[in-house]
Amino acid sequence: MPYLQLDVNEHYPSSVKRTLAAAMCETYARMMSVDIRRISVAIRELGDGGIWRIPELNAEPVPVSLLMLDIRRGRPADLRMQVAKALCEHCIRVLGLREDRLNVEFTQHDGDEMYHPTLGGFSPDWTPGEADAGSSGNATRAG
């Protein structure tokens, strides 16, 4: 973890999904000051009619997209908002998603709910000092 999961109604070529995954990983690692190797991205193509929302009272449901971000607990709301906006921009630019039909939801976890066998086991809990600790490429940083 972090685990960035995008649910969409459309289908996209693997090369486009790879481009989006790379952009999302790079942005998340930079903005959240984490080791990019801990980030996983899923782009779930649910197919036509796979995910819906009612945009206004008394309106019909419309197709939408949803980005779920499983992250370590403790990031300030302002930082989470900035990350959400940046990741939405990638989804809009790369996949052509509509901003008014894309939501972001965060699920926050303690570090010991994230296990990375190749990176030494459980992630440490997030601390405010991590944001100032240096570059996103640091292998000791968690998600």
PLM features per residue range, with description:
Residues 1-143:
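A domain-level signal for the structural core that forms small-molecule/cofactor-binding pockets
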